[in-house]
């Protein structure tokens, strides 16, 4: 398999159509002999109004890439932009506001507050920020996700799939510029997982949203417009209009050629049990998308 050029791999887009981008993005953990290079000079554009999946084995850098693009983690070198805003030079308070106002998050854990009903969980980030939701948009999101008859239910009264639908509605409710989803179907059975993936697809097609999803599942990646394959902290390939079979075959080819090594442990940093929060990697600043400053 030939190695595509860096420009081909990242499909650098026109600025007006870019939701997020990175140039020379490098992230290292530790120092000296214990240094782990999680991302190695990555150049990538995330096209606006598209569904992008990021795939790779454990330790390939996929979650670290999402964290850096979302401002949940600092970078060791390089630059990151959300739209026209360079976020690599922002202070933590500015990053917190940017995440709260312009980014939606979905994690493997649903992160719903058990004492709030579905509607209250959906509007929680805006309530914390002291903002009123766009009523027409909120009602459209609720209907699109089929939650109209579940709005007064608390999380314990909802199935796993319904809880993740609430989490999806929460991510969409503020009409963000970009939604980051980290293994959003990881805690769901296959039927519920397909429902959530269908809703993310519909958010792009019907609501003109932009979604970036980290996944290890070829079936999940097949719902996207574009798959970026990471290996050893680099983007090693890409696939337009993916199918589950084609993605699985591509991953097998990487494994056989050693193009996607999995020697490193999983990327540092996992989602917390608090709504919309993220545990920062060692020596990284705290990252809470919902914190009010």
Residue ranges and their predicted role:
Residues 4-17, 259-292:
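Intrinsically disordered, low-complexity terminal tails and inter-domain linkers enriched
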Residues 17-226, 230:
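ABC family nucleotide-binding domain
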Residues 7-10, 14, 67, 134, ...:
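Polar/charged alpha-helical tracts
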Residues 234-258:
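Conserved beta-strand-loop-alpha-helix hinge in the C-terminal portion
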């Amino acid at each position: 398999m030939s190695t595509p050029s860096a420009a081909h791999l990242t499909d650098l887009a026109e600025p007006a159509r870019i939701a997020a981008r990175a140039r020379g993005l490098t992230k290292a953990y530790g120092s000296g002999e214990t240094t782990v290079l999680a991302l190695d000079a990555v150049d990538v554009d995330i096209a606006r109004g598209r569904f992008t999946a990021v795939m790779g084995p454990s330790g390939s850098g996929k979650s670290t890439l999402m964290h850096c693009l979302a401002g949940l983690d600092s970078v060791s070198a390089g630059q990151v932009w959300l739209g026209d805003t360079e976020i690599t030079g922002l202070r933590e308070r500015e990053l917190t506001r940017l995440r709260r106002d312009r980014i939606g998050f979905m994690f493997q854990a649903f992160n719903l507050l058990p004492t709030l009903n579905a509607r209250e969980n959906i509007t929680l980030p805006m309530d914390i920020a002291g903002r009123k939701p766009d009523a027409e948009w909120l009602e459209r999101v609720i209907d699109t996700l089929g939650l109209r008859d579940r709005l007064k239910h608390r999380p314990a009264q909802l199935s796993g799939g319904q809880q993740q639908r609430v989490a999806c509605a929460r991510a969409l409710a503020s009409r963000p510029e970009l939604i980051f989803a980290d293994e959003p179907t990881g805690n769901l059975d296959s039927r519920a997982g397909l429902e959530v993936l269908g809703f993310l697809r519909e958010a792009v097609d019907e609501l003109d949203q932009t979604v970036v999803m980290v996944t290890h599942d070829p079936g999940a990646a097949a719902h996207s417009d574009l798959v970026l394959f990471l290996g050893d902290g680099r983007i090693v390939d890409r696939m337009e209009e993916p199918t589950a079979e084609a993605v699985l075959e591509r991953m097998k080819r990487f494994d056989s050629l050693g193009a996607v090594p999995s020697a490193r442990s999983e990327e540092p940093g996992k989602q917390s049990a608090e709504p919309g929060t993220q545990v920062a990697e060692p020596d990284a600043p705290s990252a809470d998308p919902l914190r009010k400053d």
